[in-house]
Amino acid sequence: VAAAQMGAGIVECDVAFTKDRELVCRHAQNDLHTTTNIVAVPELNAKCTQPFVPADPASGTPARAECRTSDITLAEFKSLKGKMDAYNPMATTPEEYLAGTADWRTDLYASRGTLMTHKESIDLFKALGVKFTPELKSPVVDMPFEGDYSQQDYARQMIQDYIDAGVKPE
C-alpha cells in the first residue's frame, strides 16, 4: 500500500509456497525467522527447518534459526505477524532475537505487518489501480517438493492465479 501511495506505478509480489502448496508473498522462501514472529510462537518455531537456537555468549556462538514458508501451512502462515527484517545474533531468547532492528531503522511497524497470499496481493493491487509484476522465487527446497510438486507446477499455479483473477497479460 505504501508503494502505491508514494506513486509506484508497478508493485510486485515475490511468490513463494507453503507446505500445503499455497502461494504467498515473501521476499525469500527462507526469511520468516527474521521477518515475522515465528520464533516466538513455540508450536510454529518447532516446525522450522532450524528452530531458534540461542546464542552462547561464553563461546561467542551466535543465535540461529531458519524458517521457510514451506515449513508451515497457509493457515499457520496467516497467523504470523510481519516485522522489519532484522535479528539479534547475540540473542538468548526468541524475543531478543526478534528485537534486532538497527538503530537507524524503525520498529514503528514491527509487530503489525500483515502477511498476504498471492491471490490477496492481486486483489489489493487491482483495488489500488497499480500495475503489478510477479517474481517467482527460486525455491531453497529440493524440487520437486515432497516428490511431486515441480518447478513447472509452481509456475503454472502462479499464472493460474492471474487467469482466475481476470488479469490479462500486457
Question: Can you say where each PLM-predicted feature lies in the sequence?
Answer:
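Phosphate-group recognition and catalysis centered on beta-loop-alpha active-site segments
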Residues: 1-170
